[in-house]
Amino acid sequence: MVRLFLHLVFLFPTSGDAARLRKHTNFKSAQKIVPGRAKIVIDPGHGGDDFGTKVGHTIEKVINLKTAEYVAALLRKSGFEVLMTRKKDVFISLADRVDLANRSKASLMVSIHFNAAQSKEAEGLEIFYFKDPILERKNHSKNLADLVMRFVLNLTKAKSRGVKTGNFCVIRDTQIPSILVEGGFLTNERELEKIRQDQYLRSLAQGIVDGIEAYLKPMHGS
């Protein structure tokens, strides 16, 4: 029920948010906006009084940020410029996350979450992209999602639930290629034990970075 409510929030921003987001309609491909070193937006989901999923002492907003910090550190080590939508435990509205991404002139955005379901048997990784009517944006986002999924599965050995289309605000209303990664189910006991291990989060982060690099490589001719 909690996850359903949170998904509805992602799908249907408030009227104030919607008014702000209507400004952002033009897609900017990575090739057009990256003159040199690529800039990447990393979006740790939830924060502040928005906990996301909570199972025992494991809170999604905390794991989202921890994983995002690992991703950011690896990207910076590889020479990328990184912009985080939040760097600490604070609430950031969906509209503000989208605004930041759209003003950043970044190459792409990755939003990081962990999953929940009523069924305790649900497990595995999901990556979402928006099925945009603008074919170029849809193709870029799907390509990014496919590559990230490939590398993440290789490193984590997790089950794949596939690359899917989604109508989440943070991937729908951004002007750059954007994906939302669900790194596993906190409601599955076996998967929760893995997620609680730091090495799993580091492997997940490395897979995300490897996928980003593979996506950007042909654009930079390297």
Where are these regions (language model features)?
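Catalytic-site microenvironment of enzymes
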Residues: 1-222
